[in-house]
Amino acid sequence: MFFERAVREEGASSVPAMRIAVIGAGPSGLATTIALMRRFRRPFEAWLIDAEDAPGAFGDGPAGRALTTEPARDLSVLPDRPDDFAEWLRGSLLAGSTVAALRGPQDMHVPRAVFRDYAMARFGEALSLRRDVRIRTFRGAVRHIGVEEAGLRVCFRDGESAKFDHVVIATGFGIAAREAASWRGAEAAAERLSQQADPPPLTLVGNGPRLAAILLDLRAGGFAGEIHVAAASGRLPQPHGRGHEGMAFGEPPATRSLKDAFRYIRNECSAAEARDGGQWQAVVDAASARLSVVWRNLPQAERNHYRRHLLRLHRHFSIRIARDVHRRLGAEFETGRTRFVPPCDPKTADENTIDCREMPSARALAGLLGRDAATLTVDDCGRLLSHGETLCGLSVVGAIASSLRPGPFTFAETVRQAYRAVLDIAPQGEARVLHR
């Protein structure tokens, strides 16, 4: 039921079509494919590859009922039109709505199914303008990505393989922790426990937006059993605050020390908070923006230190949920039916323990490439580097990139990174295609 457009036959182009693989069919993969169709100015054939889900499946079923973690103003797939999703809501869903008039669509958190419909609409529009493009979808689990003399080979677990000129890895959290598996496991466990006279508690492992959405959906569906939340930090997911627009910062130092970088960020953010009356959310967002700048000067050892000791905490305070969802989650804990318990490893737990964690795995990414995660990093354009050398033909976009660098933690950052990656593909791939 998805799109596939054949390359236009009449007046065949003299420019060979590039073969591009986009691994991951979630929001990051869709944003990347839209960016390709809007900004990549040569014929190409793109494969949207996913181990389990069709493009847009993140909006199906109970996951589609969950609210977006970010407000509409931050969910445009068009970086040159940051209010595009809010305007689409105003024109498509909220025309004449009292809610839209009172509140404005830009501040709304909507069901993910609605965001999916918007993204797919923009996908279709971009595709309709490109007669020199073919889009294919392929369901298969990627086992290995190998660099060959004239391209890259994507090998699947069923033994098949395909060769491409460029590969974009946009798996989100999905290499190690697939969202669909969390929803299915939670639903099955809740149904099983509801049929028992004296059931044990249902344990959800995690403390991010996925945990919040699944927990509240279980309660909305009538599950009345005890729920344990096994979270390393023992904290609820954090709510959104005001943006950090307007905060002014000094020139970042050209430091090669993570300690010096954080001292600069802490001092600048403290001054901005005192001067501008910023909330802690604004300070964290501003700190993330500054860390991305000083990150370029840090040696690999300092980057690895950040990933080992700071990334998990940084992510927890950077990825947030709607204020209403946060309020409902707090009220649920106050009932006593839901409580925090010490963290556990869901891989060694029983069938009533569901993994709801959202932590992209640098180790899983490195495993796909047959490399050591400690040698890898990602630059601002999504280029993947090993030992400081660019791995030609490979880009990493979205949440999976944040396993190797500070961000992107938001969808707007992911979209900007996707467009930078697409603009960077052309010079990388041109020589490879012409010398086939």
Kindly give the residue locations of the regions a language model identified.
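N-terminal glycine-rich dinucleotide-binding loop that anchors FAD/FMN and/or NAD(P) in oxidoreductases
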Residues: 62-87, 247-258, 325
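A conserved beta-strand/loop capping segment in the N-terminal third of enzymes
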Residues: 81-108
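Flavin (primarily FAD) cofactor-binding/catalytic cores of flavoenzymes
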Residues: 2-53, 99-259, 263-436
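Generic low-complexity, intrinsically disordered sequence content enriched
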Residues: 7, 40, 71-72, 79-82, ...
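Rossmann-like AdoMet
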Residues: 38, 58-61
